[in-house]
Structure formats: structure tokens, C-alpha cells
Swiss-Prot record:
Lineage: Bacteria, Bacillati, Bacillota, Bacilli, Lactobacillales
Keywords carried by this UniProt record: ATP synthesis, Cell membrane, CF(1), Hydrogen ion transport, Ion transport, Membrane, Transport
Domain of life: Bacteria
Subunit relationships: F-type ATPases have 2 components, F(1) - the catalytic core - and F(0) - the membrane proton channel. F(1) has five subunits: alpha(3), beta(3), gamma(1), delta(1), epsilon(1). F(0) has three main subunits: a(1), b(2) and c(10-14). The alpha and beta chains form an alternating ring which encloses part of the gamma chain. F(1) is attached to F(0) by a central stalk formed by the gamma and epsilon chains, while a peripheral stalk is formed by the delta and b chains.
Protein name in the entry: ATP synthase subunit delta
Gene: atpH
Gene Ontology molecular function terms on file: proton-transporting ATP synthase activity, rotational mechanism
Length: 181
């Protein structure tokens, strides 16, 4: 029996819980819970290997899973238990990432990494959000801001699908290439 790759596993599990939560009107709650579960795994990088490894017995592993499931809705609790039962705990972050991708697509939400030479103030941040939303056809833009003085000015925006480079550094390089020709 071949082991499925992580992307295939994440797609299947995420699609299943997404469809169930959507049918039951629990999509927003399930999303919030899964983001919290993902954070548990990210904050405790040894958790997934511990649950997948041989250092703990099955009862100790189940006790850890039960702690993560504590307070979770039936969908999230069932997902965690199924991932544990089928030895897919190492895929949990990927499963939540895929669920979030589906959630974002449904809500027309785009995550954008924004690089500027200086920190954006609230006015410029809101202008950038509005411009990106219009350009990308999104209802919501989630910005992950980074400051990099080497771009000299302007802004570089990276989304899952594209990169928009309006940095002064790139414009100078383009002019330099034209002059050298």
C-alpha cells in the first residue's frame, strides 16, 4: 500500500471537513477552531513527530490528542481523531492550510505579503488594501507586512498567484538594462 503525498492527503481531509461544516452552517466556527489547532502544532513543533513516533505508547498519544481536541466542535474533534487513527497527524498543518485556502476562496479573501522600504502608516495600509482588493477582485486583503530598506521605495506585493513589483530598486534595474542595451 503506497503512502499518499501530503498535498493529496491535505486536499482530501480539508475538502471533507469544509463541505460538512458548510452544509451545517459551521464554516466560520470550524475555520476559527482549525486556525487554533494549526497554531498548537506550530507552537509545539515536536508534537506531530511525537504523535507519529515510537517514543510514546498509544494511550499516551491518545491522551495528547484528547487534550488538543478539548473544547473542539464535533467536526474538528473528529478530524483530529481520524488524523490520529490513520497516522496523519504530521499532515495537520497542511490540512488546515488547505482548509484555509478553500475558506479564503469562498470569501474572496487574498493573503498578500507586502514589502516596503519603510513601515506603512494606517492610511497607506488602507489605501493599499483598497487598491489590491480592486485589482485582484477580492473582498478582503490580509496583509503580511515586511520592511526591507534595500528596495529603496515603492512596494512589492506577493500573493499566491502573482508578484507585483513597484519597487524603486526594480525600476532602477530596468532603466539600467535599457541603457546597457
Amino acid at each position: 500500500m503506497s503512502r499518499l503525498d501530503q498535498k493529496t492527503v491535505a486536499n482530501r481531509y480539508a475538502r471533507a471537513i469544509f463541505e460538512l461544516a458548510q452544509e451545517d452552517g459551521q464554516l466560520d466556527q470550524t475555520y476559527q477552531e482549525l486556525v487554533s489547532v494549526r497554531q498548537v502544532f506550530l507552537d509545539n513543533p515536536s508534537l506531530a513527530p511525537l504523535l507519529a513516533g515510537v517514543d510514546l505508547g498509544i494511550k499516551e498519544k491518545q491522551a495528547l490528542v484528547d487534550q488538543v481536541k478539548e473544547g473542539a466542535s464535533k467536526y474538528v474533534a473528529n478530524l483530529l481523531q481520524m488524523a490520529f487513527d490513520y497516522r496523519r497527524m504530521s499532515d495537520m498543518v497542511a490540512i488546515v492550510d488547505e482548509f484555509e485556502r478553500r475558506y479564503d476562496e469562498k470569501h474572496k479573501r487574498v493573503h498578500a505579503e507586502v514589502v516596503t522600504a519603510v513601515q506603512l502608516d494606517e492610511t497607506r495600509r488602507n489605501q493599499l488594501r483598497d487598491n489590491l482588493a480592486a485589482r485582484l477582485g477580492a473582498q478582503e486583503i490580509v496583509l503580511n507586512e515586511k520592511v526591507d530598506p534595500t528596495i529603496l521605495g515603492g512596494v512589492v506585493v506577493k500573493t499566491a498567484n502573482q508578484t507585483l513589483d513597484g519597487s524603486i530598486k526594480t525600476k532602477i534595474e530596468q532603466i539600467r538594462r535599457l541603457i546597457v542595451k
